[in-house]
Amino acid sequence: LCRPLHVFDADKIQGNIVIRHSKKGEKFIGLDDQEYTLDDNMVVICDENKIISLAGILGGKNSCCDRETKNILIESAYFLPDSISSTGRKLNIQSDARYRFERGVDPESTKNGINLASRLITKLCGGDLCEIIKDNSSIKRDKFIEISSNFINQILGTNLNDKLIQEKL
């Protein structure tokens, strides 16, 4: 799928999950065992008591899976490339997730990502699936681009009619 996912130990998460902007001076210990001091406006994922992830960059040590993990929460999300790039640069964090989000991930692939990951995990490890929780607060809307058939034909070196172009697009 070429899209980042993150898996949390669900039993280490307390209460509801919130995605918010960090406050200057907040601390976060990543999966790399490094402590990071955050600036204002870095996107973080939190439970009711703590930051559990730098969104789209690095998961937190406090919610990581280990040999005792029994229940998991899979995150399949879309984060804005500019936000990921800015936070990653400021904190000097390199990760596969950062690399992919910075270059753009299809926002429409979140559902396919979580479905595939869920199937693989249950096939390999067993267990039961629960509901998918979806945050619809910032649903991406389709963009419409006006383009003439003359322009398309000029670029492609063809003589396609309007009807055929509309069918293929």
What are the roles of these predicted feature ranges?
Residues 1-169:
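RNA/tRNA-interacting regions in translation and RNA-turnover enzymes
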